[in-house]
Amino acid sequence: MRRDGVFAGLLAALVLLLLPGTALAAPGDPWVAYVANSVVTKQSAAAPVILRADPATGALAEISRNGAQGDLFRHPYDIAVAGDGSLLVADMGAYATSTDHTPDGRIIRVDPVTGRQSVVASGEHLVDPAALTVAPDGLVYVVENVGTARTPAVISVNPASGAQSVIAQGGELCYPFGIAFEPRGSLVVTSYGDFSDGTTVVNCAYDFGALIRIDLASKSQSVLSRNAPEWGNLFRNPLGVTVDAAGRILVVNQNGGTALMGVDPNTGVQDAESPNTGTDRFVVPQRPAVTPDGDVVVSDFTLDDLEGGLVSVKLSTGAQSILRQDRTLFNNPLGVAIVPNRAPAAALSAAPALVAGGRRVSFDASASRDPEGLQLRYDWDLDGNGSFETAGGTTPTITRAYAGTTTLTARVRVSDPHGASAVAGAVVRVDSIRPVLSGLAIRRSTITYRLSEGARVTIQLQRKVRRRWRAVRTLRQNGVAGRNRLRAGSRARAAGRPRRVRYRAQAFAVDVVGNRSRVVRLRVSAAAARRLRR
C-alpha cells in the first residue's frame, strides 16, 4: 500500500482542524455509522431507510422511515452528518428520464434522535442529486447527476436557508455519483464513465470513469486521475469517494476486480487497497467512509443475501469482514457516513440535598458536556429505582417533591444525538419526621428538656395580660438528641410588674430542614418566673 506524501497530508489535515466546525477524532475513538437504504418500501409497505450501526455493541437501529416521522424519502442516494449532529440525505425523488428532467430532488434533514424528516432544499437545480458532502464551515456541496438541461453539476446548498448556487457545471463531469471535500479546500468528484441499461445510455470521454478535482476559488475543473499509464489502470466505474485525515483519497469501484483504491492527492497515482473477486465479501460495493482508526467502511448494495450491508476493510492489509448484515433492516444501501462519537460527561447537582418532606428539590445537569459539542438530551430517574422514567428532552433542569422520609440517589442520563450516553447521580435525603420535644422542666433559672433529634429550640416565658399571653423573654438553643440543659442568664427586672400574674413557658423545636415540633407548654410559678426574668 502506498503511503507517499504523508507529511504533506498531515499539513493538510492541520489546516482542516483549524477550520471552524471540524470534529476532532483520534485513533481509538468510538464511532457509529449511518446508512441510507436506496429502496424505501418492502412488499408494498414502508421500510427502514436510515439506519445506525454501532460497531462496539453490534447494534443496528432504525432511525427513520416514511410514515409518522415524515414522508419525504423516494430514492435516497447518499448521507452525511452535519456539524450539529443532524443527518443530511440526498434524495433523487422520481428518477429523471430522457424526456422528463423535473427538478424534484431534495436534500432532507433527519433528526437522529426522533427520526423526524424535514426539507433543507428541493427543486431548482436538484433533479437527481446523487451525493453530498459537508464542508468544515457547514456548507453542503451536492453532486447533481442529471441537471435540468441534462448537464451534471455541483451545487452548493446553504443548510440554514436552503439557497442553492451552481459551483461547476458540465465540463469534465460525466454521470457523477460521488463527492468529497479535501483539506486543501477543493472538491473531488467521481465521474462514473459509460453506462447502459437498455433504456439509459451514457457515453463519457473516459469509458471507465475518472476523478475530477474542482477548485472552489476559481471553480475550475481538472482530471486528477483516470485510467492512463502515468496514473494506473484501476478505475472501473467509480461511485463513492472520501478523503482520510491525511488528505489521501479513497474511491470505491462499483465494478471490476478492485473494490477500494487509494488515489494520491498530489500525483493522482492509483493504489489497490481491497479486491472484489468471487471469494471476497464485496458484491456490488458503493460508498466508503473512514473510521477514526483510519480503516474504511464500505456500503454494499447486495452482499450475498441481495439486501446488502456494510463491509469493514482493514486498510493496512486490505482484509475484509462483514461489519453488519440484516435482511430485516437493510434494503440495498447506498449512502454511508461515519461520525466519531465519544460519550458525554454527565454531571448532576441537587439543591437542597437535605429537604423536608413535601418540599421541592431542584436538580441541575447543566454542567454535563459532550466532547463533540452536540446538544444533549436528559432522562431522569428521580425515585432512585434505576429506571429513567422521566424524559426531560433538552432541558437540563427539573424539580421534584418527596413526601416520605427516605435517602435516595437520583440520577440523570445524558445522551448525545448519536446514542452515546453517560449517567450521573446526586444523593437526596428527605426528612418528613417532626422533632419531638418532651420533658420540659424549670428549676430555679435552669431549663431542661429532651429532644428526639438535633434541632433549634425556642423557649418563651409568657405572662397573661387581659386574657392574652404575651412573651416577656425568649431563649433559644441548638439542642441535641437526648437531654438538654439551658441556664437562663440574668436580665434587668421590668419595672411596674403586677403582683399577681400568671406565667407559663412555651417551647418548640425546628430541625435542620424546617420540620417543627408540636408546642409544649408548662405552667411556671411567679417565683420561677422572677428568676427567669432577672
Language-model regions, residue ranges each:
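Short, solvent-exposed loop/turn segments at the edges of extracellular beta-sandwich modules
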Residues: V414-A420, V510-N515
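Solvent-exposed loop segments of extracellular immunoglobulin-like
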Residues: P371-D379
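Glycine-centered tight-turn motifs at strand-turn-strand junctions
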Residues: R468-P498
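Solvent-exposed segments in extracellular or luminal domains encompassing
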Residues: T394-L408
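Short loop/turn segments immediately following the C-termini of beta-strands
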Residues: S38-V40, M92-A94, N145-G147, Y192-D194, ...
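Acidic, Ser/Thr
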Residues: D364-E372, R450-S452
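Beta-rich, blade/repeat-based domains predominating
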Residues: A26-P30, A45-A47, Q69-D84, D104, ...
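Residue position within the beta-strands of beta-propeller blades
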Residues: Y34-N37, L88-A90, Y141-V143, V188-T190, ...
